[in-house]
Regions:
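Conserved alpha-helical substructure of the radical SAM core
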Residues: 1-91, 96-104
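Short, solvent-exposed loop/turn segments at secondary-structure junctions
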Residues: 17, 65, 124, 157-159, ...
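Conserved AdoMet/S-adenosylmethionine-binding subsite of the radical SAM
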Residues: 67-228
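Charge-dense, low-complexity intrinsically disordered segments
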Residues: 34, 128, 292, 296
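Accessory C-terminal segments flanking Radical SAM cores
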Residues: 185-310
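Activation segment
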Residues: 20, 69, 128, 241-243
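N-terminal pre-core extensions flanking Radical SAM catalytic domains
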Residues: 1-31, 243, 303-308, 312-315, ...
C-alpha cells in the first residue's frame, strides 16, 4: 500500500528554542523527548532496506537539532555507517551566538560526511531569533560547506528582515507594519510554501483566502498518506506520512514489518481519510464528537484536517494514529 520512499526526514526532537506561529510540528521549548541513538540506527537501517533514498537522501531536523549537538553528530555518523545520504541538516541558527563555536560544529558535521545545511529565515523565526545570528550562521556555513552546501529558507524573507533590524528580535506585527499588509500577504502566500497543518492555519489564516469545509470534500488523502514517497520519523519512532504531522502510521523502528503489515482498518482516522477524504472525517467529527466548523473557514484541507483531529484528540485517546498525543497540546 505504501509507495517506497525516496526521501525522508528524521525529527531528532520536537524541542526547539522557538515557538513559531507557523510550525507544522508544534515545536517549542516545552518538549523533552529526543530520538535515541538505538532508534536512529533502527529507523535509518529500515529506510535503507525498504526504500531508495540514495538520490534525494534524508534530512535531519527538529525542533532544533543543534540543541543536542553530540546526538546530531552521532546520528549523522550513523547515516554514513548505513550508507544513507544526509542531504542536509536544518537549523534556525538560534544557537549561533559565537562564530568559533558555530564553525567548529559545522566542521565536525562536514568531517562526518554532511554536505549541506539548511538555515531558516522567516518572520516567524525572527520573533525569537535575532537576524544577526542567521547572518553569521550563513557566513560561517558558506566558509565550511561552500555555496552549494548552504540552503537559505527563505532568501526573500531574509532580505526583508535584514532591512528591518538585525540586532533584536522582530515581532510579527512589526514585520507586517514595516513591509505593508499587501506585501506581507503576498510573501506569506508565496515564499514559504505553507500548508495549513500545525499552527499555520490557526495563526496565519488571515493572510490566506479561506473556504468552508465543503470546499475540501472532493478528494481523499491517499496521496499524502501512502504515495508521496516522503515521510518523517519522530523521537517515538512514529512514521509520519508526508507532511501530516500528528498522524502516525505505526512504529518505524521496524519499518520493513510496518510497510508489509500496515492495516488501516485498525486506524479509523487514517482509514476514513484514505477512503473518504475530508468529507468522511468531517462527518465523523460532527456525528461522534460534536465538532463545529470554524466560522471564518479554512485556508486548505490540511487546516481543516488538523482542526478536526485536534478537536477529537482533546476528547478521546482511542485513536492510536493521533500521535504523539502531546502534539495536539502544542499546536
Amino acid at each position: 500500500m505504501i509507495t517506497p520512499y525516496d526521501s525522508g526526514g528524521l525529527l531528532l526532537s520536537y524541542k526547539c528554542n522557538s515557538r513559531c506561529r507557523h510550525c507544522l510540528y508544534g515545536c517549542s521549548p516545552r518538549w523533552r523527548k529526543w530520538l535515541s541513538i538505538t532508534d536512529a540506527h533502527k529507523i535509518i537501517d529500515g529506510l535503507r532496506r525498504v526504500s531508495d533514498v540514495s538520490g534525494r537522501g534524508i534530512h535531519l531536523a527538529g525542533g532544533e537539532p543543534f540543541l543536542d549537538f553530540p546526538r546530531l553528530l552521532a546520528i549523522q555518523r550513523i547515516a554514513v555507517e548505513h550508507c544513507v545520504r544526509v542531504a542536509y541538516v536544518e537549523t534556525n541558527a538560534g544557537w549561533c551566538v559565537d562564530e568559533d563555536d558555530t564553525r567548529e560544529k559545522f566542521e565536525l558535521l562536514k568531517d562526518a560526511g554532511l554536505d549541506a545545511v539548511l538555515i531558516s529565515s522567516s518572520p516567524y523565526h525572527a520573533e525569537f531569533i535575532p537576524v544577526k545570528r542567521v547572518v553569521m550562521a550563513i557566513k560561517v556555513a558558506l566558509e565550511v560547506f561552500g555555496p552549494e552546501g548552504v540552503l537559505i529558507w527563505v532568501s526573500k524573507f531574509l532580505r526583508q528582515l535584514v532591512s528591518i533590524d538585525t540586532q533584536e528580535v522582530i515581532l510579527f506585527d512589526r514585520y507586517v507594519k514595516t513591509v505593508g499588509m499587501s506585501e506581507a500577504r503576498h510573501s506569506i502566500n508565496t515564499a514559504y510554501q505553507l500548508i495549513g497543518g500545525g499552527r499555520a492555519g490557526a495563526n496565519l489564516g488571515e493572510f490566506f483566502h479561506k473556504s468552508p469545509p465543503e470546499a475540501f470534500f472532493d478528494n481523499n488523502c491517499q496521496m499524502e498518506l501512502f504515495r508521496s514517497g516522503h515521510a518523517h520519523f519522530d523521537p517515538w519512532g512514529h512514521l509520519i506520512p508526508s507532511m501530516c504531522a500528528g498522524i502516525s502510521l505505526g512504529d518505524a523502528r521496524d519499518l520493513p514489518k510496518l510497510v508489509k503489515e500496515l492495516d488501516i482498518t485498525k486506524m479509523p482516522v487514517v482509514q476514513t481519510l484514505a477512503e473518504e477524504g475530508m468529507v468522511g472525517l468531517y462527518r465523523l467529527a460532527r456525528r461522534d464528537f460534536d465538532y463545529e466548523p470554524e466560522p471564518d473557514g479554512y485556508m486548505d484541507k490540511c487546516h481543516l484536517c488538523v482542526s478536526i483531529r485536534k478537536h477529537i484528540a482533546q476528547r478521546t485517546r482511542k485513536f492510536k494514529e493521533l500521535a504523539p498525543v502531546e502534539y495536539y497540546e502544542q499546536i
